[in-house]
Curated annotation (Swiss-Prot):
The keyword Heme applies. Keywords: Electron transport, Heme, Iron, Membrane, Metal-binding, Mitochondrion, Mitochondrion inner membrane, Respiratory chain, Transmembrane, Transmembrane helix, Transport, Ubiquinone. A ubiquinone binds at H201. This is Cytochrome b. One of its GO terms (biological process) is mitochondrial electron transport, ubiquinol to cytochrome c. Binds 2 heme b groups non-covalently.
Length: 379
């Protein structure tokens, strides 16, 4: 008799994705971040659902409803901080996951990679709208500044901004629609993640060497199920250390002041995971130019597969490319630091140089390094 997990229409899907899936025997812990992102997504949807039960999306009561969650709702404080810091863990995993893809050449799976880029955009949009909901000073001014960037679009810009706002400023209509979008987007992200997996399972996973491993694949269960569970436990451990010891470490103190349209905070800045993009935005002294650079800083990932000039897939045996990769990582850390600094000398020039370096590394230096390596290997 055949096993039910191999014949039942629903269980067959689960079986082929998580149990009998042929997996490379040598994938490292860098391949854990996909499952960790799934864990984060489930955690965010669950904590978000319970927060939504007590939150009110009205400008008069939004701030106090969040305070009410923290003070009066049973374990409301832990749900709120798990959700806020869960977003930070989500982005740490996202950046690691994208970095892994860049390093080991996983971007050659075009459909999987491009859906991943769409997922990154969707997650950033969700996080931005979620940050607006507590209706603190940084929520309000962050929403005002970022939505205002759309006014840089020629001809339709101003109308577009007012349409998104639902009025002539960020107000009740804006907050209500942001709450609606923030609620629906994670489910769209879940659907996209399933498509992401679907395309990945068409080709099978890459591995650190970048060499096809079809000859010696192993079943996903029990080897990688246990590995993923260990990863998830470590993720939850780090998250709970943040939540229980320093819940406000990654937040902005300004967001504990209720939103006031008449009082602008001295330094408007987004959450830490957007600072690199914010630094690129600010480094260009032209509004439209800044907006384009901001979008291109993420959209450039779509070009990466077409800039791959190496004869090898992975960077594992390519020291010059490795050097370029770590230059890019250092540059992104520099941009993150600059994004949180005031707009004054010397930060302006450092930000501009780091922004140029970012695009130069991806568009010129990495493909050049690959070509040099090909020549050194006489390929």
């Amino acid at each position: 008799m055949t096993n039910i997990r191999k014949t039942h229409p629903l269980m067959k899907i689960v079986n082929n994705a998580f149990i009998d899936l042929p997996t490379p025997p040598n994938i490292s812990s860098w391949w854990n971040f996909g499952s960790l992102l799934g864990t984060c997504l489930i955690l965010q949807i669950l904590t978000g659902l319970f927060l939504a039960m007590h939150y009110t999306s009205d400008t008069m009561t939004a701030f106090s409803s969040v305070a009410h969650i923290c003070r009066d709702v049973n374990y409301g404080w832990i749900i709120r901080y798990m959700h806020a810091n869960g977003a930070s863990m989500f982005f740490i995993c996202l950046f690691m996951h994208v970095g892994r893809g860049l390093y080991y050449g996983s971007y050659t799976f075009l459909e999987t990679w491009n859906i991943g880029v769409i997922l990154l955009f969707a997650t950033m949009a969700t996080a931005f709208m979620g940050y607006v909901l507590p209706w603190g000073q940084m929520s309000f001014w962050g929403a005002t500044v970022i939505t205002n960037l759309l006014s840089a679009i020629p001809y339709i810009g101003t109308n577009l901004v007012e349409w998104i706002w639902g009025g002539f400023s960020v107000d009740k209509a804006t907050l209500t629609r942001f709450f609606a979008f923030h609620f629906i987007l994670p489910f769209i992200i879940t659907a996209l993640a399933m498509v992401h997996l679907l395309f990945l399972h068409e080709t099978g996973s890459n591995n650190p060497t970048g060499i096809p491993s079809d000859t010696d694949k192993i079943p996903f269960h029990p080897y990688y199920t246990i590995k993923d569970i260990l990863g998830a436990m470590l993720l939850i451990l780090v998250l709970m250390l943040l939540v229980l010891f320093t819940p406000d470490l990654l937040g902005d103190p300004d967001n504990y002041t209720p939103a006031n349209p008449l009082n602008t905070p001295p330094h408007i800045k987004p959450e830490w995971y957007f600072l690199f993009a914010y630094a690129i935005l600010r480094s260009i002294p032209n509004k439209l130019g800044g907006v384009l650079a901001l979008i291109l800083s993420i959209l450039i990932l779509v070009l990466v597969p077409f800039l791959h000039t190496s004869k090898q897939r992975s960077m594992m045996f390519r020291p010059i490319s490795q050097c370029m990769f770590w230059v890019l990582v250092a540059d992104l850390l520099t941009l993150t630091w600059i994004g949180g600094q005031p707009v004054e000398h010397p930060y302006i020039i450092i930000g501009q140089l780091a922004s140029i370096m970012y695009f130069l590394t991806i568009l010129v230096m990495m493909p050049a390094a690959s070509t040099i390596e090909n020549n050194l290997l006489k390929w």
